[in-house]
From Swiss-Prot:
<protein>
    <recommendedName>
        <fullName>UPF0246 protein PSPPH_1119</fullName>
    </recommendedName>
</protein>
<dbReference type="GO" id="GO:0033194">
    <property type="term" value="P:response to hydroperoxide"/>
</dbReference>
<dbReference type="InterPro" id="IPR005583">
    <property type="entry name" value="YaaA"/>
</dbReference>
<dbReference type="GO" id="GO:0005829">
    <property type="term" value="C:cytosol"/>
</dbReference>
<dbReference type="Pfam" id="PF03883">
    <property type="entry name" value="H2O2_YaaD"/>
</dbReference>
<comment type="similarity">
    <text>Belongs to the UPF0246 family.</text>
</comment>
């Protein structure tokens, strides 16, 4: 089973990594093409394109300017340890053992607007480029056009390498839209996490993101390799709901938020 998750806006390049092991991103030629274009933008243009404050626009203009594909532990960090959003709070990658990191390296991928697809130990330099950014480029009107079927083809390669055709989608709609389902040689398993609020079960973004990270951790710890085994996920009060689920969409409900 191969999992895909979204990246995060929040980054941590200050905390020392918990491992000295790393790999290099596989698709830096594509990243370099984007960086070359992004360097032509002024901070004001970046602010308008990405809907950022002047301060954040200036920060990311500087990041684009200093981006250098000669990645080392001195100027970059492993992707799974660098991202620090809600998904990664749920995943708690900093507490994974070496054996669990090895498993994650084979069975987990992070989608990225700049890097396309990252493995957990791939080094990355800090950036801000959400997949939904409408950056017109030589390949089309936005980043979805830029990546085209490429991400799907890379996922096919990863699926073939890890031994089955199961792709567990734990990414947001914005990011999984960069995966062309028609180009995938995979059975896609989608997920929904709902919390009880105001008399009904609903998807609450903050909790759903954390749950995606917790399920990623669950798969890594238990070495899950089937949709049926995923039904046992019961972290922090979530329970599989058979009535709302289908074979290719697993729904988990929670009545009370657990710390």
């Amino acid at each position: 089973m191969l999992m895909v998750i979204s990246p995060a806006k929040t980054l941590d390049f200050e905390t020392p990594p918990t491992t000295g092991r790393f790999t290099q991103p596989q698709y830096l030629d594509h990243s370099q093409e984007l960086i070359t274009q992004l360097r032509e933008l002024t901070p004001a243009q970046i602010s308008e394109l990405m809907h950022l404050s002047d301060k954040l626009a200036g920060l990311n203009a500087a990041r684009f300017g200093s981006w250098n594909p000669a990645f080392t532990l001195d100027n970059a960090k492993q992707a799974l340890l660098a991202f620090k959003g809600d998904v990664y709070t749920g995943l708690q990658a900093e507490t994974l053992s070496d054996a669990q990191l090895d498993y994650a390296q084979d069975h987990l991928r992070m989608l990225s607007g700049l890097y396309g697809l990252l493995r957990p130990l791939d080094l990355m330099q800090p950036y801000r480029l959400e997949m939904g950014t409408r950056l017109a480029n030589a390949r089309g009107k936005d980043l979805y056009a830029f990546w085209g079927t490429q991400i799907s083809e890379w996922l096919n390669e990863a699926l073939a390498a890890q031994g089955d055709d199961l792709l567990l989608n734990l990414a947001s709609t914005e990011y999984f839209s960069a995966v062309k389902r028609s180009a995938l040689k995979a059975r896609i398993i989608d997920t929904e996490f709902k919390d009880f609020k105001n008399g009904q079960y609903k998807i609450i973004s903050f909790y759903a993101k954390k749950a995606r990270g917790m399920m990623s951790r669950f798969v890594i710890e238990e070495r899950i390799n089937s949709p049926e085994a995923l039904q046992a996920f019961d972290v922090k009060g979530y329970r599989y709901n058979r009535e709302q689920s289908t074979p290719d969409k697993l729904v988990f409900l929670r009545n009370v938020v657990e710390d």
